[in-house]
Each structure stands twice: as structure tokens, then as C-alpha cells.
From Swiss-Prot:
Homodimer. UreD, UreF and UreG form a complex that acts as a GTP-hydrolysis-dependent molecular chaperone, activating the urease apoprotein by helping to assemble the nickel containing metallocenter of UreC. The UreE protein probably delivers the nickel. Pfam families: cobW. It is found in: Cytoplasm. Gene3D superfamilies: P-loop containing nucleotide triphosphate hydrolases. GTP binds at G25, P26, V27, G28, A29, G30, K31, T32. Belongs to the SIMIBI class G3E GTPase family. UreG subfamily. GO terms for biological process: urea catabolic process. The gene is ureG. Its main location: cytoplasm. NCBIfam families: ureG (TIGR00101). This is Urease accessory protein UreG. Keywords: Chaperone, Cytoplasm, GTP-binding, Nickel insertion, Nucleotide-binding. It comes from Haemophilus influenzae (strain 86-028NP).
Length: 225
């Protein structure tokens, strides 16, 4: 994370005491699983709320209600009714209203996760909606995914490459993915995870604490640049 990004976060938080973390990525990559695992680990330490986006349903919100440790009233589903790009970028009004409602309901909130609907590699968040962004891809999509680029790969503040346990079953060389991610990310961090077993989940939490919450902690060793 650059000093520019840290300065930007500080400026945005002058009038509020919470951070907005956008989580995007293709369908099935592990966005909801990441938020579920994160909230289980950090809910006892931080005040957390979640906004999910689905086109026609509230399936992700319902999953988190059943599986995370957050009470149902801290999880809100937004039905976008159209392209998931629009709801997080060109016209983020529904999500901004959801965030406002959530932080009004819970004035102590410190972290608001905003999960986009499943998308391709071009998803980006409006800077008004997300202070920092995490983009999730998975090994099962193939080792060529990092080198395909797209804003999600190249511009997100943290890239999560999930489902590393599937690599031998889908013929993926993780070293190739690492090489290509290094090249495409140009110094920005990424991390390999197996969220089913919580492998390197602590690294994602460490990144959030250091670069989103701006805590004075060491950079996680599992981050790759």
C-alpha cells in the first residue's frame, strides 16, 4: 500500500470512524466465504457490518446470516436488479444508502464490508463507496487468470488468489500464477489462500489491520509483492 493510499484513507475518515472495504471478484471465487471467515475471526475485536450485492436475490446475505458470527441486523442485502458493475461504480446510490443506514443503526461500527455481485475481471468500486478494495480470484479458473489483467487484478489494493488446494487437480502451477501476479500487480500485494482451511486468512486480517485500519503492526509475511 502506497503512502498516497494511506493519505487518501486518512482524508476520507476525517468525518467518520469507520472504513469501507470493497470485496469483488468472479462468481464462485470465494468473496462471500472470505467475508464469512473474516467476520468469524475479527467480530470479537472490531465492530463489523456487511452489505452484499446480488442481482435478483439476497442469497449471499442469507448465507452470511446463517454462517457468520454477526447478528442478522448487521448484514444487509442489496438487490441491484441489473449489472453488478453499475451498483458499485457508476451508480452506487443503493449501496451508499445501505451503508448510511447501517452506520446509523450501529454508530460504533468500525468496518463495513461491501461485497459486489459476481463479476468478471473488470470490477472496480466507486471511490465514494469503498476506501480500499480486495479482489478475489481462484485457482480453478486457471493459471492464466492473473496475466489476463483487468482492473480487478491490477488496481485492487489486495489481490486474493483462493483455493490453492485445487491446484494439483486442475493442472495449475502456483509458481506461474505468482510470477504473473507479481508482474501485473507491479509491487502491490497479493496473497494465496485456502479459505476452506483458513490458510493465510491471518495474512488478510493483517493486511486489513495495517493498510485499512492503519494499525502500527508488521506487514504479514504471507503477503507477496
Amino acid at each position: 500500500m502506497s503512502n498516497t493510499v494511506a493519505t487518501m484513507i486518512n482524508k476520507r475518515n476525517i468525518m467518520r470512524n469507520y472504513i469501507k472495504i470493497g470485496v469483488a471478484g468472479p462468481v464462485g471465487a470465494g468473496k462471500t466465504a472470505l467475508i464469512e471467515k473474516l467476520t468469524r475471526e475479527i467480530a470479537s475485536k472490531y465492530s463489523v457490518a456487511v452489505i452484499t450485492n446480488d442481482i435478483y436475490t439476497q442469497e449471499d446475505a442469507e448465507f452470511l446470516t446463517k454462517n457468520s458470527l454477526l447478528p442478522p441486523e448487521r448484514i444487509m442485502g442489496v438487490e441491484t436488479g441489473g449489472c453488478p458493475h453499475t451498483a458499485i461504480r457508476e451508480d452506487a446510490s443503493m449501496n451508499l444508502e445501505a451503508v448510511d443506514e447501517m452506520v446509523t443503526r450501529f454508530p460504533d461500527v468500525e468496518i463495513v464490508f461491501i461485497e459486489s455481485g459476481g463479476d468478471n475481471l473488470s470490477a472496480t468500486f466507486s471511490p465514494d463507496l469503498a476506501d480500499v478494495t480486495i479482489f478475489v480470484i481462484d485457482v480453478a479458473q486457471g493459471e492464466k487468470i492473473p496475466r489476463k489483467g483487468g482492473p480487478g487484478i491490477t488496481r485492487s489494493d489486495l489481490l486474493v488468489i483462493n483455493k490453492t488446494d485445487l491446484a494439483p487437480f486442475v493442472g495449475v502451477d502456483l509458481s506461474v500464477m505468482e510470477r504473473d501476479a507479481r508482474r501485473m500487480r507491479n509491487g502491490q500485494p497479493f496473497i494465496f489462500t485456502n479459505l476452506m482451511k483458513k490458510e493465510n486468512l491471518d495474512g488478510v486480517i493483517g493486511w486489513i489491520e495495517k493498510y485499512a485500519l492503519l494499525k502500527n503492526v508488521e506487514e504479514p509475511a504471507s503477503l507477496v509483492r
